[in-house]
Amino acid sequence: MRKKVIRCSLNPKSIEKAMREIEEYKREIIRKTELLRQRVAERISETASQGFGSAVVDDLLRGGARSASVDVSIDTRGNVSVVIAKGEDAVWIEFGAGVYHNGSAGSSPHPKGGELGMTIGGYGKGYGKRNVWGFYEDGELVLTHGTPAAMPMYNAMKTVCAEVVDIAREVFK
């Protein structure tokens, strides 16, 4: 969007015309700002979806790795858009589970993990403090090394923060 120059003379018609131009310019800025918000949210959603799609949710001792089941969506209310990762695997993929892949118990490979209380071995009964633990699924004992922290939401934010100037230039051109 180019710099807008509005000229007017000191007479009622010219001032009214200038005021209409200002209102039109204001509407255009609001429209483009909404478009920027939408484009940024879409880019975060797209990038996070790719991260969740390629993540391992369980590193099983038998049967290999299991893929995640996470849906990423955008919720827009008024002038706020929120990117949401929904699914029982989302938190494990974002923050990791178990010391085998993620470092010592009580730490977090995720830059926000400690701040948010998402530390390794800190959830539930603390089985993630072990290299291997099990859970029952369909009556069968399943042994796992846990989940490597893939951080798809965090990484999507970092990626889009690096791209936001280019996105804004494209929207406001």
What are the language-model segments listed below?
Residues 94:
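His/Glu-rich zincin catalytic helix
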Residues 1-90, 102-173:
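Short, Lys/Arg-rich flexible segments
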